[in-house]
Amino acid sequence: MANLNIVTLLGRLAKDPELRRTQNDIPVTTFSVAVNRRGKDQGVDFIDVVCWRNQAEFVCRYFSKGMAIFIEGSIQARTWKDKDGNNRKAVEVVAYNVQFAEPKRDGGPAV
């Protein structure tokens, strides 16, 4: 059986993305996307997303809180120890394609 790990999200940025750089000077950003649930008990899920390199720079330059965003990526789980030595785990979407999901706002950037 083949394995498949593909995620497609359409939602809104929960806050402005911020560009950081790794120790090797690789651009990266993490942000949350608010996505409405389907079904009777509708609610909102906040999905953590990571973008690297050109995608990270693109998102930080042209997207801001509240903007609609379309994301394609894959789910990644990672573990680490926090400063107190506790084991921590995160599940996030690593984006490989990010696009605008609504027309340009007045006064917004032209891309």
Question: What do the PLM-derived regions correspond to, one by one?
Answer:
Residues M1-V111:
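Single-stranded nucleic acid-binding surfaces, predominantly the OB-fold ssDNA-binding core
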